[in-house]
Amino acid sequence: MNIAVSPTAEGSSGRAQVQWSLRWESELQLADHAELAEFFRKSYGPTGAFNAQPFERSRSWAGARPELRVIGYDARGVAAHIGLLRRFIKVGEVDLPVAELGLYAVRPDLEGHGIGHAMRVMYPALQELGVPFGFGAVRSALEKHLTRLVERQGLATLMRGIRVRSTLPDVYPNLSPTRIEDVIVVVFPVGRSISEWPAGTVIDRNGPEL
């Protein structure tokens, strides 16, 4: 789950003016991709120059390309973003259809509120898509942040001690085509209860992360 969170936050002024838009990927125009790419470069750049590289020019995705996006706009342009991609993952030995959530980023003045608002816009779409679960994976450094924003509000369950295997978005002669990461798995129950999530300590995306 590509996620960018700024280390600082401003006051809450301007949060009420954010307008949330649910956009299918085929609805986006070149200008939309260019605006989103610039937003991601500014959001992911502070976390490391390498993290901003996928968004060169007008590319508005990093690994797998989302099919649906929730985008928050205000007078300053793009304020927040989260993407969705339906896919099958393997949890242990069980093949499971999920909606992977990723490409999350928020401007500093919305920090602490962006993901909660975005998920409230996204959740009805998850229900309409008929998926049993929303799924994401974040590095352990963001555990407290996600606990505060989604787990305590009852939006999701955080699972620890899980390893996720993904393919790289491109093939490099000097790198393995797959990588395995120890991450925090975030599960959003949609069509099923969290008790129906399969047991397993290894999840295979069989593709690049969103």
UniProtKB/Swiss-Prot annotation:
Q: Keyword set for this entry?
A: Acyltransferase, Cytoplasm, Nodulation, Transferase
Q: Does the keyword Repeat apply?
A: no
Q: Which GO terms describe its molecular function?
A: acyltransferase activity
Keyword Nucleotide-binding found: no
| EC numbers for this chain | 2.3.1.-
Q: Name one GO cellular component term.
A: cytosol
Its EC top class is: transferase
Protein purpose: N-acyltransferase required for nodulation. Acts in the production of a small, heat-stable compound (Nod) that stimulates mitosis in various plant protoplasts.
Q: What is this protein called?
A: Nodulation protein A
